[in-house]
Amino acid sequence: MGFSGKISSSFLRQSAVVQIVLVNAVVFVIVHIAALFGIGYVGEWLMLPQSWTEVMSTPWTLLTYMFAHFDFLHILGNMLCLYCFGIVALDLMTPRRFVATYIAGGLAGAAAYLFAAEFVPSPGLIGSSAAVMAVAAAAVLTKPDYHVRLWLFGLVKIKWIALFYVAFALLATRADASAVCAHAAHLGGILADRKSV
């Protein structure tokens, strides 16, 4: 088995949560390496544009935006929460359903963002926040008192982690008019797939 075959085999042995985290991490690294070599448009190529008209000419962005990040704290916060809620969600649903929930949340977030962008100018959308919020909502709505062990805090109910994550997502968004569109995407993700489990 060649090197690429070993990597592929190792990837497929991971849980669905780890697979999505790895895809996000690899895309993040590729975007930043490309930027170092003056190929900054790679990130823009993955970003969801601000209008349906532009999306029609770049339809792949409906999927790619939810696996891409520009900012380290953005990907770190999203992946930590995805891992935390994903472990719970995988106890409640199949891996296939888990991935479907992630993608449904991302697509719902994209639709909500594009609707809001019709009224408020925005530069485009990137990041997995909406998709992660769909996973978090699926876990919290089913098992709000489920405990996870956090390194510094011990056992914590996931409903409190979800509350912190939503607050983090809202506070981490730029404090300008375009933030309305980002918040719309987050809300779209939360409401995306409440019947997942």
Where are these regions (language model features)?
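A detector for small-residue-rich transmembrane helices and their helix-helix packing motifs
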Residues: M1-S196
